[in-house]
């Protein structure tokens, strides 16, 4: 596999790796591409000069990053034109990992992580009028903000972690998601229990942010849109000793929307279901609504959230039919909401076909 690694200057605990990848629109795959594949590939007519051009592009990006003092804002204007010229993606992975030759205090690590995230979201934070992002609930609200570009949401999600709040929400994921889709969770349940136990043992942030490398196994090339990928893969990478979080840049917004469109065609409505179920607040709402019909203000009171926040999440769940609305018998003009058992059965059926 053709790779290029470089340390990020004065950020010794962060490493960067650029991997040449191919997005195969016909088969909806993203996979690493080697020089030999390009030269001798049989499924597509890969040209050697095309690969060399991409390799030069990759090295130029690395060089630009170094020259800019690791200011990544130039990527928006730099990546897009080349993505349109050929079907390759340059994926830049930023690793937060331990440096065995350097002793770093917890405060230094926290500051390093905070500065790294701030470099990426500073403009977004100012435009959004938000002073700071703290805790997993605030993170959810940020990710739901339609003004934030898709690639920025991916990056914020991948680089942000608050251990105390995250652990609490992991338990919420586990206790709520499992009953909702219990028939399809037996494998995920066992795996997740192991990861959660390992995560609870961690006492040093430097162990939490360990080196994590993306593997492109030749037998696992298809990007399967499954519950384990969308709901638990992110948690797994953040909760397992020996792994860390990563961020990728290169798939621009329009390309991401195209990928989602293809995935929806290929997998029916499963992607939309899983995106809705991958939010902790919505899972907690479903847990409450499984017991009885509830109004917005009742749900807000139970979850200790504001009514506008609940209304936002309800609109998403209503759109894909996971919950249904009916008029209240006790209060004129007010809707009550409940879980659609039939739609949950549909989701379980779709999941079972992916095994």
Model regions: which residues?
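A short acidic, leucine-rich amphipathic alpha-helix
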Residues: 285, 298-304
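Beta-hairpin "wing" of winged helix-turn-helix
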Residues: 320-329
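Short capping segments at the starts of secondary-structure elements
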Residues: 280-283, 289-295
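Residues within helix-turn-helix
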Residues: 296-297, 308, 315
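Conserved segment of winged-helix/HTH DNA-binding domains
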Residues: 334-355
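C-terminal regulatory or interaction extensions
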Residues: 186-270
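Helix-turn-helix DNA-binding motif, specifically the short coil turn and the N-cap/start of the second
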Residues: 292, 306-309
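N-terminal, charged low-complexity regulatory/assembly segments
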Residues: 1-219
């Amino acid at each position: 596999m053709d790779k290029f690694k470089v340390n990020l200057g004065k950020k010794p605990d962060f490493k960067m790796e650029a991997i040449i990848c191919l997005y195969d629109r016909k088969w909806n795959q993203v996979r690493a591409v080697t020089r030999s594949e390009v030269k001798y590939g049989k499924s597509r007519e890969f040209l050697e000069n095309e690969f060399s051009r991409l390799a030069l592009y990759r090295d130029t990006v690395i060089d630009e990053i170094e020259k800019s003092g690791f200011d990544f804002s130039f990527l928006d204007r730099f990546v897009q034109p080349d993505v349109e010229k050929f079907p390759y993606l340059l994926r830049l992975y930023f690793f937060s990992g331990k440096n065995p030759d350097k002793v770093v205090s917890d405060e230094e690590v926290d500051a390093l992580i905070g500065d790294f995230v701030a470099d990426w979201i500073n403009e977004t934070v100012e435009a959004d009028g938000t002073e700071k992002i703290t805790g997993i609930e605030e993170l959810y609200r940020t990710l739901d903000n339609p003004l934030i570009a898709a690639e920025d949401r991916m990056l914020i999600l991948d680089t942000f972690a608050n251990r105390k709040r995250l652990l609490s929400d992991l338990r919420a994921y586990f206790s709520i998601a499992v009953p909702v889709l219990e028939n399809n969770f037996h494998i995920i349940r066992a795996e997740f229990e192991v990861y959660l136990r390992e995560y609870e043992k961690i006492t040093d942030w430097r162990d939490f942010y360990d080196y994590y490398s993306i593997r492109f196994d030749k037998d696992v090339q298809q990007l399967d849109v499954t519950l384990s990928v969308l709901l638990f893969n992110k948690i797994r990478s953040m909760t397992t000793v020996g792994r860390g979080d990563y961020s990728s840049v290169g798939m621009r917004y329009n390309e991401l929307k195209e990928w989602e469109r293809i995935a929806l065609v290929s997998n029916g409505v499963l992607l939309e279901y899983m995106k809705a179920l991958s939010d902790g607040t919505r899972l907690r709402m479903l847990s409450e609504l499984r017991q009885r019909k509830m109004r917005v203000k009742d749900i807000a009171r139970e979850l200790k959230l504001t009514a506008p926040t609940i209304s936002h999440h309800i609109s998403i769940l209503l759109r894909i039919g996971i919950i249904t609305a009916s008029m209240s018998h006790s209060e004129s003009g007010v809707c009550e909401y409940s879980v659609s058992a039939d739609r949950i059965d549909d989701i379980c059926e779709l999941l079972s076909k992916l095994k």
